[in-house]
Amino acid sequence: MTAPVQVPQSLLLLLMLLLTLPATGSDPVLCFSQYEDSSSKCKDLLGKDVSLEDCCLNAAYAFKERDNGHCQACRSPRWSPWSSWAPCSVSCSEGSQLRHRRCIGWGGQCSENKAPGTLEWQLQACEEQQCCPEMGGWSNWEPWGPCTVTCSKGTRIRRRVCNNPAPKCGGHCPGVAQESEACDTQQVCPTHGAWGPWGPWSSCLSSCHGGPHKPVETRSRTCSAPEPSKNPPGNPCPGTAYEQQSCAGLPPCPVAGGWGPWGSVSPCSVTCGLGQILEQRKCDNPVPQHGGSFCTGDDTRAHICNTAVPCPVDGEWEPWGDWSTCTRPHLSAIRCKEIVGQQTRVRICKGRKFNGQRCPGKHQEIRHCYNIQNCIFGEKGSWSQWTPWGLCTPPCGANPTRVRQRRCMASLPKFSPTVSVVEGQGEKNVTFWGKPLAQCEELQGQKVLLEEKRPCLHVPACKDPEEEEP
């Protein structure tokens, strides 16, 4: 067993002083070690009154400016996932529904120069049920049924059916399908005896073992709940009015537990950013026995520690850029011809800091292509099917509308879909690049693009969901 490390008392006093000094720089915040993307909540509070710069040394951490404030992530700002679609604004016929996302992060802006905390909305049409409920009507009441008992007073019932007319589309008839009333047989019922509750057990001489006696405890009950009637005669209570049992097997007397001393301080739990140091104690002074109560309070306690070292941030790929023009070196005229060219696209690795991991994969892609930009080919084009209805725009403004489209689709030439570039390396796929000129029969007065618009109905208001929480 190794001896515990002796920490000089002066060093401990210095550490406690540093932890209690107020943070400098920006206003202090509540610092958390985890940001939960699925709920936009802060998890695992590290400490209060921490400076924003110290808390965000680790980009995986999060902070709140006040107890009831929004949770904000320390990472570079980016949009949260879209929320689930809210319930439809009406329960039948056509309505609308909203969803949202929030710019989450610190030290920058999301796309479109949106500041952290900004909400962005989407609105779409919805239809929970095509038709609305229609109420039905009741039939006439059936005759009353027989009385439920053969003596004394009971009840009888009668029924009716919801079919005059029948309800439609989930509707119903108002009122009840069955009703009851009292009935009297004019016959007296016998009263059968029933036991009242058992009385309490008599006291044993001791509540825990170790005494000189093994006492017996007894209890009794009476046939009085109710007593049996005499005319007409009722049945007596079955069974016995008394019972007894031995008090043997009483437990040993309990011993309550007590805390031992706090153990030594552990190292800081992290090597970068903010972490914790822990102390522990055991409930062994004495150990609880024979049902005695366990020690109250916590067996661990934590203090915040600051490594003052920023945590690595791995790089992340930006989206691929657009493909370059399809060309072929030393050959200028390949447009509209079955001549294979090449094009490239690139992407940028952003956000890498403090010796974080580089982005995996390549930053450039090359593919083979045919240049068909603004080309006219022999066959006429054809109109596409209607696209799905788009989102309602504006989602939070007045009179939002939705649009669907049909486009004139140009016919593509029957060029070879593959090409052999280097002998022994097999065939490579060839992609069409550019937009050929489309020539379609005129449709509703349009030659290229046909659009249909509709208003969005029963539009709900855009409200921050976090402001609706109690």
Swiss-Prot record:
Q: What's in the domain note?
A: TSP type-1 domain 0 binds to TSP type-1 domain 4, and TSP type-1 domain 1 binds to TSP type-1 domain 6. These interactions mediate multimerization.
Limits of the TSP type-1 domain:
27-75, 76-133, 135-190, 192-254, 256-312, 314-376, 380-463
SUPFAM superfamilies found in the cross-reference section:
TSP-1 type 1 repeat
UniProt entry keywords in alphabetical sequence: Complement alternate pathway, Disulfide bond, Glycoprotein, Immunity, Innate immunity, Repeat, Secreted, Signal
The UniProt entry, under PANTHER family, shows: PROPERDIN
Q: Which organism is it from?
A: Cavia porcellus (Guinea pig)
Q: Where found in the cell?
A: Secreted
Q: What is this protein called?
A: Properdin
Region annotation Interaction with Complement C3 beta chain: where it falls in the sequence: 350-358
Q: Which SMART domains match?
A: TSP1
Signal peptide range equals: 1-26
Glyco sites are at: 82, 85, 138, 141, 144, 150, 195, 198, 201, 207, 259, 262, 271, 320, 323, 383, 386, 389, 429
State the disulfide connectivity.
Answer: 31-55, 42-71, 56-74, 88-126, 92-132, 103-110, 131-169, 147-183, 151-189, 162-173, 204-247, 208-253, 223-237, 268-305, 272-311, 283-295, 326-369, 336-375, 349-359, 392-456, 396-462, 408-440
